[in-house]
């Protein structure tokens, strides 16, 4: 049972409260039984599950609860709070300092995905604007340097290693010295792993640690071993000063929940989780947003961060066009490019309230990305006049031979080009409405700048554009309005970043 299954089962248990006519002790116990069964199936320690049940029962006294209170809401809140506590070690994680050398040393057993995770972390910080690099001090595993070199080259990250030097301490020290002199901000050192916790592994880790004096030692943990993670993490913490943990392979193993709760029990903060084999299948781990996404409640904060990463406010030309209600096919193409930059599509969908981690299966995700690429391929066959026309759809309707030319050039049927133009027309209509709303692009809190009735009209326009199935998963019109309110308050001025995204 992967994490998506765990989320679905807990959500189903909580939903049973909504179906119950009267909320009494029997209904509460039945719901808790389902939640606990799901957690045990995910390999969460039985003592932790028992504690969660007792804490919820202690927090909810149905007999003493005032009649005016929403019992369902109170119970759901109590369960949510206890699930957060289950994966929260209660320890603040180390964070790097911008503008100075931050040395991060990776440790872990062989096969945990340590080398790949080094590259993922370097790439993550590189995308955030940090100067990052990689050092391969793994001289034990054949091909370790080749793997790191390949990953680093693909992501355009500077790296250091040696095919001739066999002493990992020398390689690590030389690499750190080199990159410090070049003012790199994130210096990641990959060390040797073993098949088991050998004394020689710990001795080597200590030597490398003493040589490079890391600011943070990260232990990489394989989620597939479940609650056995606790013993492993403690063994490493006893030998070296492990400050953070990254849990890998959470995308396809039944024991992910057990692994996360076990690590939290060691009081080691989990800083990231690996959710796939690709370099951007990597997410910062924050307890509340994680549980929120798991239960299909979304992560607006994470979505805002993704949109802010695109630095859309810097694109003054686009903002000026949006203010005047103008939107060309080239603008739509650029918005599709922005969606591609935001990371794995399933990861983004999971941040929207109403979409659990199981809504977007790998097959659906690939299908959506393929569709997006197909639309971009069609636009690649258009000329400048077509892409930059203020009403591109009208130009094509007046001269249908253009549709045939674009279809031939992109290798698609004419109906595919027509579908793209229909999509574009919907976007252009919404932008026209946005351009007529005063205060939308003013900056600051949009909820204060924008007339509520105008905002409601815009929400209705967006609802018309959306697939009915998508709108249903968001909780209908009320769910869409709630999400937009959160987005307005948290990402003032960045609403145009949602362009194109809402209809995918």
Swiss-Prot record:
SUPFAM superfamilies: P-loop containing nucleoside triphosphate hydrolases (SSF52540), Signal peptide-binding domain (SSF47446)
Family matches, as PROSITE patterns: SRP54 (PS00300)
Region M-domain: start-end pairs: 296-504
Superkingdom field: Eukaryota
Protein's UniProt keywords contain Lyase: no
Cited SMART domains: AAA, SRP54, SRP54_N
Gene Ontology biological process: exocrine pancreas development; granulocyte differentiation; neutrophil chemotaxis; SRP-dependent cotranslational protein targeting to membrane, translocation
GO CC terms of this entry: cytosol; endoplasmic reticulum; nuclear speck; signal recognition particle, endoplasmic reticulum targeting
Region G-domain: start-end pairs: 1-295
Disulfide bonds: none
Binding locations of GTP: 108-115, 190-194, 248-251
Function field: Component of the signal recognition particle (SRP) complex, a ribonucleoprotein complex that mediates the cotranslational targeting of secretory and membrane proteins to the endoplasmic reticulum (ER). As part of the SRP complex, associates with the SRP receptor (SR) component srpra to target secretory proteins to the endoplasmic reticulum membrane. Binds to the signal sequence of presecretory proteins when they emerge from the ribosomes. Displays basal GTPase activity, and stimulates reciprocal GTPase activation of the SR subunit SRPRA.
Family: Belongs to the GTP-binding SRP family. SRP54 subfamily.
The name this protein goes by in its record: Signal recognition particle subunit SRP54
Source species: Danio rerio (Zebrafish)
Origin organism lineage: Eukaryota, Metazoa, Chordata, Craniata, Vertebrata
